[in-house]
Each structure stands twice: as C-alpha cells, then as structure tokens.
Amino acid sequence: MTSATDKSIDRLVVNAKTRRRNSSVGKIDLGDTVPGFAAMPESAASKNEAKKRMKALTGDSKKDSDLLWKVWFSYREMNYRHSWLTPFFILVCVYSAYFLSGNRTESNPLHMFVAISYQVDGTDSYAKGIKDLSFVFFYMIFFTFLREFLMDVVIRPFTVYLNVTSEHRQKRMLEQMYAIFYCGVSGPFGLYIMYHSDLWLFKTKPMYRTYPDITNPFLFKIFYLGQAAFWAQQACVLVLQLEKPRKDYKELVFHHIVTLLLIWSSYVFHFTKMGLAIYITMDVSDFFLSLSKTLNYLNSVFTPFVFGLFVFFWIYLRHVVNIRILWSVLTEFRHEGNYVLNFATQQYKCWISLPIVFVLIAALQLVNLYWLFLILRILYRLIWQGIQKDERSDSDSDESAENEESKEKCE
C-alpha cells in the first residue's frame, strides 16, 4: 500500500531542485485568496524582535517579576511561531463555557456566538437580527484558527514530505492547499443547499419570485453567515497589509470591498438567494485555481489539464452565470414577485434597490473581467509559447526571493 502511494505521489511530484523556472501558473494571484499568517514572509524587524525575546528568555531571573516576564515572552514566542494558539485558546474557553453550562438555548449569552439565533418556533427556519453579527465575529476567530492550524500542523509537514525544500515555495503551497480545503468544502456545501432549493442550476426567476426571503433554513443560514465570517476574516488580514502588496493590490481591495457590500446588503435586504449563487461561483472556480497552482508548484504533468479546467469553470461561473444574473436584474427584477418599497413588511425590491444591486454585481464582474484578460494571456502563452507567466501577481520576485533565501542559508 505504501509503495503504491509513493508511486502515485511520484507521478505528481518532481524534485523541487529540477523544477522548470519559466512556469508561473502557481503564481496567479486572483482576488479571493489572502495569505494566512503562517504564509507571511518574515521581515528583518520580526527577526530582530525574535532575537530580543530569545535573549530575554535565556537571561537570569533575579526577581519574581522577571519570571512573569519570561512566561509572557515564552507565550509570545510560541504564538509567533504557532499563530493558531491564541484563537485556539479563545475557542476552547468559549465552547467549554457554553457546553458545560448545560443551557443550549438562546437565553445563554454565549449562544449568539456559538450557534445561529432567531429560530422561528416550530420550524427549521431562522430570522435575522443583530445577534448574527456576534456569530460572524466569533467564526472569524474560528477561521483564523482553522487556517493557521491546518497550514502549520497539517499542510506544512505534507509539503516537506513532497520534497518542497524552498521556504518561499512552501509558503505559497500553504496558501493554496488551504484554499483547496476550504473551497472543497464550501463549494459542494453551497451546491447541496442549492440542489435542495428552487435555485438549482442557477435559476434566476426564483431569486425574485419568493422575495422577500425574511427567513432562511438552518443550513442556508449557517452557510451564509459562515461565508460572511470567512470573507470578513480575509478582509482583516488584507487591511493589515502583513505581506508585500501584489501588483493588483488595488483590484484586490476593490474586490473585497464589493464582496463585503454584497454580503451585507443581500443579507439585510433579503436577497440571499442571489447571494448563494454568487458564493458558489466564486468557491468552485477558486477550487480549480488553487488546485492548478498547487500542481504547478509540484511540477505535475497534470498542471496544463487542470489549468484548462480552471479557465473553463472561471469563464462559466464568474462570467456566464454572473452575466445571466445581471441580465435578470434588468429583465426579471421588476416582474417576478413583489416590486414595492414597504418598510413595514421589509419589502425592498423596488426602483431604489434595482440600480444598487446591478452596480454592485457589475463592479464584481469588471474585476473578474480584468482577471480573465490576464488569465487568457497566460493560457495563450501556455498553448502557443509554452510559457506560463503572470504579470499581475507579486511573483516577479519569486525567483529572486528564493535566491536570497539560498544565500541566507549559505551565510
């Protein structure tokens, strides 16, 4: 069994030392992927701070206060090396307090953080309210833990097993393999919810026919708020600018702003069916993007094939489906379901919301079109020139970064 596994891995992997230097499918940085803390490059300042902490830890303790400082520095050093520790402690404390209390109802103050709120009595449907923000905030912490833990404890050892020796390339793989995991779960989850709704295969008329969708089923609400937490957590990392900005940093920021506005407005103003479809288009296409990049890092012979699949799903989901949704806003928005402004009954599908919905989705489409142009350029070079180069990423310096890394090791 072990030899069979090794042979299958050998088909995917060629030693990193013999990897072709002109390939950069793995360097395509599209708008939905933001690096985790584990994949951040270590700056000179952070290295100096680490040296100071280690020096403080090795010094003699003359007073009790020195011992306390050592404990604090020890924790900081551990947290710096394993950034999932702090969110892990927070999650353990909250979950333990919640489950040990024996009160799993909404009367428990911790319920709004751990579980979704506003269940409609006697049904599987849930309304919306301010407590949903607490759920999103708590699961932002959860996704911070999940991302850093998987990268540090699961994915990094796997990259070492695959003989990825370059630290720079290893960090790139951490990002993409986590994206494969997340999108590999969220994409099918979203499709499952869509299959059990009237939206299957991205039908547009049901998006408006049952409006307003003031309540949502259990799984639907978990998926929607979970996605909101995931995107909000990514936005926080992006705002902190913990890594060198990519060439398309402005487009990346714009993409996240538009996405967060779409998430908030679609949830508050009851356009969640439309939001579900857009979530799925992004997750499924991102899965194939990250898969093609990971295979490219491994110098796999399957890279061109998977990259071709990625291009197909990107065009179909992010352009064909999204443009169909845009067209439905112009043609079906007014005629399917109620079309009236009534604050008392939470009816917001009216002449005011129509242009807002259209502009937000169109803005997202413009960013995707810009990225499509760059993707097609890469595809053209891959087919006609055998070069897989991406000018829009921050990876112009990828090889130089690896060279600098080699020099540091030699020194």
From Swiss-Prot:
UniProt region (Disordered), positions on chain: 390-411
GO cellular component, one term: endoplasmic reticulum membrane
GO MF annotations, alphabetized: sphingosine N-acyltransferase activity
Annotated catalysed reactions: a fatty acyl-CoA + sphing-4-enine = an N-acylsphing-4-enine + CoA + H(+)
Pfam families: TRAM_LAG1_CLN8
EC number(s) from the headed UniProt entry: 2.3.1.24
All ranges on the Cytoplasmic side of the membrane: 1-81, 156-176, 233-251, 318-355
Ranges of the Lumenal topological domain: 103-134, 198-211, 273-296, 377-411
Bilayer topology term: Multi-pass membrane protein
Domain TLC: 168-384
Transmembrane segment boundaries: 82-102, 135-155, 177-197, 212-232, 252-272, 297-317, 356-376
InterPro entries per UniProt: Lag1/Lac1-like, TLC-dom
Subcellular location, record wording: Endoplasmic reticulum membrane
Glycan-modified residues: 103
Keyword list, A-Z: Endoplasmic reticulum, Glycoprotein, Lipid biosynthesis, Lipid metabolism, Membrane, Phosphoprotein, Transferase, Transmembrane, Transmembrane helix
Family: Belongs to the sphingosine N-acyltransferase family.
Role of this protein: Component of the ceramide synthase complex required for C26-CoA-dependent ceramide synthesis. Redundant to LAC1. Facilitates ER-to-Golgi transport of GPI-anchored proteins. Involved in the aging process.
Protein name, as recorded: Sphingosine N-acyltransferase LAG1
